């Protein structure tokens, strides 16, 4: 076996045959290599065949040294201890030659599969791997819960689409989620793809989510850059409604109800004691009153907000392996139109139609209590029948141990 720098073609051919995270991609390499020159492709070859690969990026640390990050890599057969130890031992040598101070490694390796309430369905024994990496100097950072600004989320909510059609996926959802999706179609909620020049439309809705949940994530430039990095594998999607069309739809249904009510009133004149007719008339009158109210509300909305309402928007990345629901926002004033449900269904069907086997709702905190900061988000994802995947977490390898300690002291001083 030989530890080598890979060509772009060698890297691409290998990841195309393996399950990988979207950050381990040719798109990511192209952008970083062209714009920042801060990306490396390394791997292992045996008899000229690539058997391991990893995209690494670098950043400045302590002025003269570098910090490296593995972006959910490396991609290799972790059940092969000889290959695993060979890669990680030789990675240290490579990093030292690149003036690395330390590296953060976060393999895309499952620790547990759980149900939506956190109960373990399947456990993966990673103790041998952790011990092997520990002996090589890679320190496991523990099993984190919650969100972090310094590492990738360890808990993901995922919907399995493999060998399933739209009908099956809908049947497996919670009743209310299924009903909400159906209602978005009944109301005429539509979805369109936004151009990168329309990022501000997405970002305005995203900022509403930041305000609602009291967090600050990224600026508009970040989302524009992500669209450039994953230009052929990302989408900004907008759910919106044409209120004039919606009003006409309501008026048509209301007119039909009025005809039915008139017909029932005529029948009651002929048979005033018909309990069945009276019950039906009461029900239809209630429905008709509801439609009248909705028509008036819609007319008011048109007069104050205009004809088109932007309901919700989401940023997606997709690969051959997964569709990733990464960032989103919605206007809380228009929750009754349930734009977020329409967006999810649009991209779930996109995944099914393109034979992509996983719909990744992405991060949750891993705190399954009712007091968790993302309890509502978890319940939303649970409604789609998503399960939870808990990953192994981060490893840090100090390459220059003394200087790394100085780096940590300096970092902690700034935090205080």
Regions found by a protein language model. Give the residues of each.
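A conserved beta-strand-loop-helix scaffold within acyl/acetyltransferase catalytic domains
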Residues: 3-47, 51-64, 138-150, 160-334
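A short, hydrophobic/aromatic-rich structural module that often spans a beta strand
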Residues: 117-130, 150-168, 332, 401-416
